[in-house]
Design a protein with these regions (language model features):
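Hydrophobic packing residues within well-ordered alpha-helices of enzyme cores
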Residues: 12, 86-89, 116, 137
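A structured beta-alpha segment of the ubiquitous adenosine-cofactor-binding alpha/beta core
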Residues: 36-37, 104-123
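Short beta->alpha connector loops at strand-helix junctions that form conserved
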Residues: 72, 77-79, 107, 128, ...
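ALDH superfamily catalytic-core signature
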Residues: 97, 124, 132-173
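Residue-level signal for inorganic ion chemistry
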Residues: 71, 103, 125, 155
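Periplasmic-binding protein-like
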Residues: 65, 124-128
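Long amphipathic alpha-helix in the N-terminal Rossmann-like dinucleotide-binding domain
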Residues: 1-24
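Conserved small-residue-rich beta-alpha loop and adjacent elements
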Residues: 28-99, 168
């Protein structure tokens, strides 16, 4: 828990420091003869963050902070295996002074989650989870070209293998 708490705090710093310059208004001079341009980034709507059971705060936190920095509100749907961690994360956002309704945490089963995925006001969907859940999201959203979908499916961590390792066991894992 201590490692994840440190990772959450570090992720906030990195996300803020790296994201703010990228989303700042940009003026581009001389884009064409006698023509200048300005790029403005605007919020697009509600972000639905479907959190994982492993690193339940760290991974969801990065997606939530990015959405908030972009001016979007967030619905956080944590894993049912990490409800307490999710509540602590929601409490941190509340303690930081975010207005009511900017971040909402909703616990639901897969049917309730799919209702949120399909809702027309939800414009960004982040899932860190399994292939089956990712396929369900794609099956329910592929016709709505206004939604941005980010799926991180079944990522694996790097393993360090020492000389005395049981290779058959290590490769199976």
């Amino acid at each position: 828990a201590l490692v994840e708490a440190g990772a959450v705090a570090g992720k906030v710093d990195i996300t803020i420091n790296e994201s703010l310059p990228r989303i700042a208004q940009k003026n581009i001079e001389g884009i064409m003869p006698k023509t200048n341009a300005r790029i403005n980034f605007k919020p697009i709507g509600i972000s639905l963050v479907i959190g994982p059971f492993n690193f339940p705060c760290h991974l969801a936190n990065g997606q939530m902070v990015s959405s908030l920095l972009s001016g979007n509100s967030v619905i956080f749907k944590p894993s049912s295996k990490a409800c307490y961690c999710a509540q602590l994360l929601a409490d941190c956002f509340e303690a930081a002074g975010f207005p009511e309704g900017v971040i909402s945490m909703i616990h639901s089963d897969r049917h309730g989650t799919m209702d949120m995925v399909k809702h027309p006001d939800v414009k960004v969907i982040f899932l860190t989870g399994g292939k089956e859940a990712g396929l369900r999201i794609l099956e329910n959203t592929y016709k709505d070209l206004t939604k941005l979908i980010s799926l991180e499916l079944g990522g694996k961590n790097v393993s360090i293998i020492h000389e005395d390792t049981n290779m058959e066991l290590a490769l199976a894992e």
